[in-house]
C-alpha cells in the first residue's frame, strides 16, 4: 500500500469515496474509527464518513478527536473535507460551492482540544490560517481544471445543532460577518490544526438560512441539493 498522506472527510451526503476501496479500523485513545482506504492514481487516500456510512451520528455526538487522531495515526498530512451549509450571503445561492476561509464558533458542549488536562503545559494554537491556504489554492486549481465553479471564500459559523437556527440568530450571525452556517467544521478544523495537519473544506450550499428567503427550510429540498452537489 502506498503512503497515506491524504484524507477526505465526507460530510452530509458524502458517505463513500466513489472508487474501489477496503475498510480499516483504527484504534485511538478516544475510540475506534472506521475508514476506507482507496487508491487513486499514484496515491492511497483515506476516506472517513464524518456522520458514519448511514448518517447515524448527529453533529454534536461525532467523536471528532478520535477521527482526527485516527487520520494522524495513519500518517495523513493533508485533509480535504466537505460540509453541507446554509447560506447567509445572497451571493452564495442554493446549489453553489464555496471554500471555507475562516470560522466563528457557537458550539457549546463539544470537546474542543487535545490539550484538556494541561499535562503538556499551556498550548495556544495559532488560528490565523485555520483552513490551509495552500490546500485552498489546490482546491481552486482542481476545480478550474474540471470546470467546477466556486462562488468564493466563505466565513463559516458553527452551531451546536442538531436543530436549525432561528431568524434572530441568523440576523446576528450576518452582523458578525458569517457567510455560511453549519454544525461540524468546529472542532474538526481546530483539532487538525492542533495536530499540525493541513485542512481545507468545501461548503455545499443546500439551503438559504432562515429569514434569507420566502419560506421555512425544507428537508426534501436539502436532499435534492446534496445529491446535485455530490456529483460536483
Place the predicted regions along the sequence by residue.
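Active-site rim beta-loop-alpha module in soluble metabolic enzymes
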Residues: 130-175
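Short, hinge-like loop/turn segments at secondary-structure boundaries
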Residues: 96-101, 198-201, 217-220
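Metabolite-binding pocket within alpha/beta catalytic cores that recognizes anionic/polar moieties
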Residues: 1-127
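His/Asp/Glu-rich mid-to-C-terminal helical/loop segments that flank catalytic regions of hydrolases
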Residues: 210-232
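Short, flexible loop segments at the rims of nucleotide/cofactor-binding pockets, characterized by
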Residues: 55-60, 157-160, 178
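Polyanion-binding loop/helix "lid" in catalytic or ligand-binding cores
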Residues: 120-131, 170, 225-232
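Short, acidic/turn-prone active-site loops that include or flank metal/cofactor-
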Residues: 102-105, 204-210
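A C-terminal functional module that forms or caps the active site or interfaces directly
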Residues: 167-208
